[in-house]
Amino acid sequence: MLRFWRATINTRNGLAFAIRSEAAIREELVALALALPLAWLIGVTTMRSVELVAVVALVLVVELLNTAIEKLADRLTTDHDPQIGRVKDMGSAAVGVALVMAGLFWLFAIAERIGVI
């Protein structure tokens, strides 16, 4: 139980630091807060609504991982390093892919809701 409690505190601390230090995290939390009520309006089924919220949460997860990679890379060196630059670019690409995927989920859900598909 103590291990679970410590993990919970670490989770809270990590999320709090990310919120304080990264605008993208704050923006994605706003998107997640907006997604909650919108998903229930747009979702044709309960499961579709859950999927819509989950895909936005997934973007937040990927952004947190990308932020962790960037912070670690910046800690290793502040000098320009092409390999670290490529690693950061890959993290950014992961966020981009997650955003496109989320956008497609929402687009198809809206199309389904209005009867286009």
Where are these regions (language model features)?
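Hydrophobic alpha-helical transmembrane segments
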Residues: 2-68, 76, 80-82, 88, ...
